[in-house]
């Protein structure tokens, strides 16, 4: 009995020790895990769910919503593509897809600045930042060239020319980014994350040139005789102007703000992540949505008659939908022509059409009915102004007092 009770006590002690060990390990894991994240989440992705660093969750939500809207716009444009018949609206569809692809890349790159950096993440950041912005700015520059042609001449460049120009302009930034990575990482064998903020900004000078040229060319899209395309130019100008403001703000904060606020590198990643999300939404709201809306609008009916244009003959629709020209409502009245008036005077007995000279020895004859009929013949307008009745001369009128 004594041995059995001793064994039970030992078993209870072992179970109590195991329970305390489990509770202690769980408490230590909870203490090391950020609030809002799971236990099995890698430390690299803690910023995506850490409630103590709320900026990551906010920027993540904004970027995710922007990515969904961009995908929806691409799907709408793809579905409605067979119904776009107008040549000037169908030619830039490829450019629109390219621009939406670059905007989607900006929203996706935002997550690379939220998670913790390593060698791979830093290389992706340094390469894709300049390339994606170069793609978007190149598409905006090609669009500015197209709208300027449409406003001035009424016809734009072909679709392959727009896409080719955008890709060629983007290729320059690809070469710059590759050279920067090769010279600093491969040749000098430095870590990919070991770079100064000034070096990062200097590698983006070409993007700044594209943005400034786009802003300058967008100003000329507001001048031209084809006014139906000026609204596209206005939205393009707004997009370029807001992009300039965003770039000035983030470069000021990235280069000087963190130093002045004595934050070190703590705010570098939030600054760049917010810049990507804000730029993506500017591109979507002020360029992608207006352009796609304009592209999907039905074409104008060029053969529709303008009933308010008096310089054109009026048209009416017959039962067979044939256009028949009608006479003008303001036809010239020829009843008062001088030839008919002189003929009427000769008929009344006045030689050579002279009203004031009578032949000697004769009082002449009273003007006959043809004379009175030739004096005045009302026009259609006179009938309308007279209330629909034809004005006639009184019975005692002799026809002598014509004016």
Curated annotation (Swiss-Prot):
<dbReference type="GO" id="GO:0005615">
    <property type="term" value="C:extracellular space"/>
</dbReference>
<feature type="region of interest" description="Disordered">
    <location>
        <begin position="349"/>
        <end position="371"/>
    </location>
</feature>
<dbReference type="GO" id="GO:0045666">
    <property type="term" value="P:positive regulation of neuron differentiation"/>
</dbReference>
<feature type="topological domain" description="Cytoplasmic">
    <location>
        <begin position="293"/>
        <end position="403"/>
    </location>
</feature>
<feature type="topological domain" description="Extracellular">
    <location>
        <begin position="116"/>
        <end position="126"/>
    </location>
</feature>
<dbReference type="GO" id="GO:0050729">
    <property type="term" value="P:positive regulation of inflammatory response"/>
</dbReference>
<keyword id="KW-1003">Cell membrane</keyword>
<dbReference type="GO" id="GO:0043123">
    <property type="term" value="P:positive regulation of canonical NF-kappaB signal transduction"/>
</dbReference>
<dbReference type="Pfam" id="PF00003">
    <property type="entry name" value="7tm_3"/>
</dbReference>
<keyword id="KW-0225">Disease variant</keyword>
<dbReference type="GO" id="GO:0005886">
    <property type="term" value="C:plasma membrane"/>
</dbReference>
<feature type="topological domain" description="Extracellular">
    <location>
        <begin position="256"/>
        <end position="271"/>
    </location>
</feature>
<keyword id="KW-0325">Glycoprotein</keyword>
<keyword id="KW-0597">Phosphoprotein</keyword>
<keyword id="KW-0807">Transducer</keyword>
<dbReference type="GO" id="GO:0009986">
    <property type="term" value="C:cell surface"/>
</dbReference>
<feature type="topological domain" description="Cytoplasmic">
    <location>
        <begin position="221"/>
        <end position="234"/>
    </location>
</feature>
<feature type="signal peptide">
    <location>
        <begin position="1"/>
        <end position="28"/>
    </location>
</feature>
<comment type="function">
    <text>G-protein coupled receptor involved in the regulation of cell volume.</text>
</comment>
<feature type="transmembrane region" description="Helical; Name=6">
    <location>
        <begin position="235"/>
        <end position="255"/>
    </location>
</feature>
<keyword id="KW-0812">Transmembrane</keyword>
<dbReference type="GO" id="GO:0043235">
    <property type="term" value="C:receptor complex"/>
</dbReference>
<feature type="transmembrane region" description="Helical; Name=1">
    <location>
        <begin position="57"/>
        <end position="77"/>
    </location>
</feature>
<feature type="topological domain" description="Extracellular">
    <location>
        <begin position="29"/>
        <end position="56"/>
    </location>
</feature>
<dbReference type="GO" id="GO:0005654">
    <property type="term" value="C:nucleoplasm"/>
</dbReference>
<feature type="transmembrane region" description="Helical; Name=5">
    <location>
        <begin position="200"/>
        <end position="220"/>
    </location>
</feature>
<feature type="topological domain" description="Extracellular">
    <location>
        <begin position="184"/>
        <end position="199"/>
    </location>
</feature>
<dbReference type="GO" id="GO:0090263">
    <property type="term" value="P:positive regulation of canonical Wnt signaling pathway"/>
</dbReference>
<feature type="glycosylation site" description="N-linked (GlcNAc...) asparagine">
    <location>
        <position position="30"/>
    </location>
</feature>
<dbReference type="InterPro" id="IPR017978">
    <property type="entry name" value="GPCR_3_C"/>
</dbReference>
<dbReference type="GO" id="GO:0019901">
    <property type="term" value="F:protein kinase binding"/>
</dbReference>
<comment type="similarity">
    <text>Belongs to the G-protein coupled receptor 3 family.</text>
</comment>
<feature type="transmembrane region" description="Helical; Name=7">
    <location>
        <begin position="272"/>
        <end position="292"/>
    </location>
</feature>
<dbReference type="GO" id="GO:0045121">
    <property type="term" value="C:membrane raft"/>
</dbReference>
<protein>
    <recommendedName>
        <fullName>G-protein coupled receptor family C group 5 member B</fullName>
    </recommendedName>
</protein>
<dbReference type="GO" id="GO:0004930">
    <property type="term" value="F:G protein-coupled receptor activity"/>
</dbReference>
<dbReference type="GO" id="GO:1990782">
    <property type="term" value="F:protein tyrosine kinase binding"/>
</dbReference>
<dbReference type="GO" id="GO:0043231">
    <property type="term" value="C:intracellular membrane-bounded organelle"/>
</dbReference>
<dbReference type="GO" id="GO:0061098">
    <property type="term" value="P:positive regulation of protein tyrosine kinase activity"/>
</dbReference>
<feature type="transmembrane region" description="Helical; Name=2">
    <location>
        <begin position="95"/>
        <end position="115"/>
    </location>
</feature>
<feature type="transmembrane region" description="Helical; Name=3">
    <location>
        <begin position="127"/>
        <end position="147"/>
    </location>
</feature>
<dbReference type="GO" id="GO:0070062">
    <property type="term" value="C:extracellular exosome"/>
</dbReference>
């Amino acid at each position: 009995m004594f041995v059995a009770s001793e064994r039970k006590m030992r078993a209870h002690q072992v179970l109590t020790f195991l329970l305390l060990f489990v509770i202690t390990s769980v408490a230590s894991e909870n203490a090391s895990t950020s609030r809002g994240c799971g236990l099995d989440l890698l430390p690299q992705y803690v910023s995506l769910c850490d409630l103590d660093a709320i900026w990551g969750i906010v920027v993540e939500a904004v970027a995710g919503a922007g990515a969904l809207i961009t995908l929806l716009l691409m799907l709408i444009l793809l579905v409605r593509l067979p119904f776009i018949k107008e040549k000037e609206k169908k030619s830039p569809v490829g450019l629109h897809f390219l621009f939406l692809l670059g905007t989607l890349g900006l929203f996706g790159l935002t997550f690379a600045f939220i998670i913790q950096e390593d060698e791979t993440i830093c290389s992706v950041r340094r390469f894709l930042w300049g390339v994606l912005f170069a793609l978007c700015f190149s598409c905006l520059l090609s669009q500015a060239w197209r709208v300027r042609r449409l406003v001035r001449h009424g016809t734009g460049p072909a679709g392959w020319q727009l896409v080719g120009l955008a890709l060629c302009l983007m290729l320059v930034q690809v070469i710059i980014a590759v050279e920067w990575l090769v010279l600093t990482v491969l040749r000098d064998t430095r870590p990919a994350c070991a770079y100064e903020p000034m070096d990062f900004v200097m590698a983006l000078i070409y993007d700044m040139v594209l943005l400034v040229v786009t802003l300058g060319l967008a100003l000329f899209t507001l001048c031209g005789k084809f006014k139906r395309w000026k609204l596209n130019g206005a939205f393009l100008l707004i997009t370029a102007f807001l992009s300039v403001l965003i770039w000035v703000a983030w470069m000021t904060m990235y280069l000087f703000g963190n130093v002045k606020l004595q934050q070190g590198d703590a705010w570098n990643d939030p600054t760049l992540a917010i810049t990507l999300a804000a730029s993506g939404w500017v591109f979507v709201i002020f360029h992608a949505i207006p352009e796609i809306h304009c592209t999907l609008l039905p074409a104008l009916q060029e053969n529709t008659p303008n009933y308010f244009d008096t310089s054109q003959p009026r048209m009416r629709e017959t039962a067979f939908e044939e256009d028949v020209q009608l006479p003008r409502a303001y036809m010239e009245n020829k009843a008062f022509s001088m030839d008919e008036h002189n003929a009427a005077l000769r008929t009344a007995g006045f030689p050579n059409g002279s009203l004031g000279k009578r032949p000697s020895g004769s009082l002449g004859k009273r003007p006959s009915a043809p004379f009175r009929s030739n004096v005045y013949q009302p026009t259609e307008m006179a009938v309308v102004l007279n209330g629909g009745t034809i004005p006639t001369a009184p019975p005692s009128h002799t026809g002598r007092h014509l004016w």
